[in-house]
Amino acid sequence: MEEISKSKQDGNSWEPTGNPKVLWTALIAFTYGFSVWAINSSLAPYLKDWYGYSASEVLIVAAMSPLFAAVTSLVLGIASDLWGGRIIFTLLLLFLPLPMIGYMFADSYVAFLCVGIFMGLGGASFIIGNTHVAVWYPKERQGAALGLYAFGNVGVAVGMLLVPFLLNTVLGGAPGTDLPPKLSLGPFEGWRLIFPVYGLLSLILAFVYWTVTSEPPIRNKKITFASIGSVYKSSTLPWILAYLYGATFGALMFNSAFLPTYLVDQYDIEKQKAIMVFVPIFVLLVAGSRPFSGWLGDKYNPIILLVYCLGAEVVLAAALSMQLAFPWQMSLLYAIAIFYGTGASLVVKIIPLYFKEVGAVTGLAKTAGASTGAVMTIVMSAVKGTTGEYTYGWLIWAGAIALGLILALRVQQRS
């Protein structure tokens, strides 16, 4: 594969034709970022046992990462438009070890909430790499390129697999529990040693990203704070696309935070099996569907395809509210996962077709997606706490997707 695909240059004009180095480096860094995001969800069932927290309490801890990602994604998207993905992604990777240091000292519920918030920056990495990759590829190839980049969603599965593997085979857990520490480093032992490993990897990736990637030879000078502000005011389309991203990509955020605790609480699945088997399969189905669906968005009308995806999601989400026997419930979850990933890729494909401020609009969409993850996890926690079951939570989710379907049909009619 060429180091950098040749781009057409003539004076001040420049047309992107691709940059594999940026694409693959961004994919690796994004995968790492999402594996960081998964740490809270992976630890939640263990914290429930070690500290005696309720299912509702650990769901709130798991919701902190997507909540902060929602707050920061819009800012990082705008920053990537203005100053480029290379410097913004490098700075993010340099910052991520700081909350990990905090996790090494956390020993109360409030402390876990606080450090869990800042781990959400790993999830916010998506918007930076998405913007960086998009500027290097022409519109007719952006669907495939961004779909491949979005395979980095698999980082959630990596985190789900790596954390319990390290706990159970290498590091151990917490003192005085059924999973005692196996290794120690000064005052730190067992599960807390996950964070120095992750922090060191973040610093290495920061060096690699800055060294290997590059910015386009001619940046889009037309993108300014004023132009970014005007795009939010120009029409309702950025806000509709943001909602649609919440109904697709947001589902990954919601389910990756919610499912480990849900499977243990609702179906009495052993926590290691829930985290290392059932949830990673769900994430792999979401991530695996994104490259192909991005390619489909290049070949066919992405808005029409999105309408069909959302229709399927509504039906499957309503079926999940029936709380079927475990094999059937997992079959429904795995089926809907494919439509989540497909729909998310289609929304990402649609954005550059309408807007040059890809980072700003995608940042708004990512904010909606991460907010969906946080809000729906909290909704499920509240529903469980008040009714003793999750049925109404799934119905609320089906209703939210149905609204997205109505909005997508409006966009289709206008286009």
What is each model feature region?
Residues K21-Y53, L76, N255-P260, M376:
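Extracytoplasmic
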Residues Y300-V347:
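C-terminal transmembrane helical hairpin of 12-TM major facilitator-type secondary transporters
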Residues N168-G172, G199-R219, L407-Q412:
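C-terminal membrane-cytosol helix-exit motif in multi-pass small-molecule transporters
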Residues I60-G77, P280-F292:
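Central cavity-lining transmembrane alpha-helices of secondary-active solute carriers
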Residues V115-G152:
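Cytoplasmic helix-loop-helix junction between adjacent transmembrane helices
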Residues G143-L171, K366-M376:
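Glycine-rich segments within core transmembrane alpha-helices of 12-TM secondary carriers
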Residues V71-Y109:
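Conserved MFS/SLC helix-loop-helix module at the cytosolic interface between two early adjacent transmembrane helices
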Residues N40-A44, T236-P291:
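Extracytoplasmic gate region of multi-pass secondary transporters
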